[in-house]
Amino acid sequence: MRDETDVVVIGAGIVGLSTAYALSRQRPGIRVTVLEKEQGPARHQTGRNSGVIHSGVYYRPGSLKARYATRGAAEMVRFCAEHGIPHQVTGKLIVATGREELPRLHALVQRGRENGIPVRELGPSQIPAYEPEARGLAAIHVATTGICDYGTVARVLAESSKADIRYGAEAGLISRRLGRGVAVRTKDGTVVRGRVLVNCAGLQCDRVARLAGDDPKMRIVPFRGEYYELARPELVRGLVYPVPDPVFPFLGVHLTRGVDGGVHVGPNAVLAGAREGYSWPVVRPADLAGTLAWPGFWHLARRHAGYGLGEVGRSLSKAAFTRAVRRLLPAVREDDLVPAPAGVRAQAVLRDGTLVDDFLIRQGPGTVHVLNAPSPAATASLPIGREVARRVLGVLERG
């Protein structure tokens, strides 16, 4: 079976679906086919995160993350409101619990202001007015942070895009001929031909790029983020975060009250034994071998061994995880933490061991690859989708 289309999108996470949605809005009548190997949308990063609409306070001014998160947060709130999707603008606290964190907290204040985000500085006596159980030396309150149900957002994007979305359609082969577009053969033998290929494959994006004949110059290293549900959700009003270490693109163990009223605690960040390794027993030798064969992984491991061991300790020891939480909320007990589903973050790592700290979008002949889109990509998905669509339309216009 062979099908013809204008654009083939691989991946029905929130970025792939936002791209299909943006294409349909920017060029009505365009033919878009989305290929997704799972049986539904948003099965991996999109559907397995904290559900936070990030304000953009963390990100380097001028970066894609800063620009797209600040813009995307407001757009996501509007999108949810227009489509009746559960959401709430809750604000959040970022709490410094040690003196060594105070300079980093002040730097966040400056960064937030540079990004145009309203930030309020709080002393220790002011913290309980926002979160009665939180304790710290100082904190900042970011009023524009919110929460939503990204799985529902993805489903609405899928419906609104009018794209031909095919679930259970895993790309097996990709061929490309100069001036003649691309052809994707799925593992069931179907061939889909298009003029442009868009790679939004998330945890598999580097593999899809190589399948298309492009060198991504990075590898995805999967980091599992483990969560607990708080048995006493009344301890938390909204969102409580630690001060992150700027060396790492992870925000630390935090507490998030979701749209369902439950409070998620986490995530940590531990190396996963598979691209879709949502627990310790899940190990895929091919995935693990690919990680270990990448020189960048070993550079990264040597550089940050101490941090990595600490994360492993919090993964294997519930008591250690609880201690991390109690730095923010001393009232939390170990038996308050109930295991919840984990997520896996697709983190791009360069050959020299650099953790890619911004969104990464690259182009090849007839291809557009989204190669690094971890948090805050869900928040920023509408602007990311427009940017990818802009590049796709540029390729189509050039013929």
Residue map of PLM features:
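Flavin-dependent oxidoreductases
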Residues: 18, 174-283
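Helix-loop-beta segment of a Rossmann-like dinucleotide-binding subdomain
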Residues: 86-96, 108, 121, 126-161, ...
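Dinucleotide-binding Rossmann-like beta1-alpha1 core, especially the glycine-rich loop
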Residues: 51-126, 136, 252-254, 262, ...
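Glycine-rich FAD pyrophosphate-binding loop
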Residues: 24-47
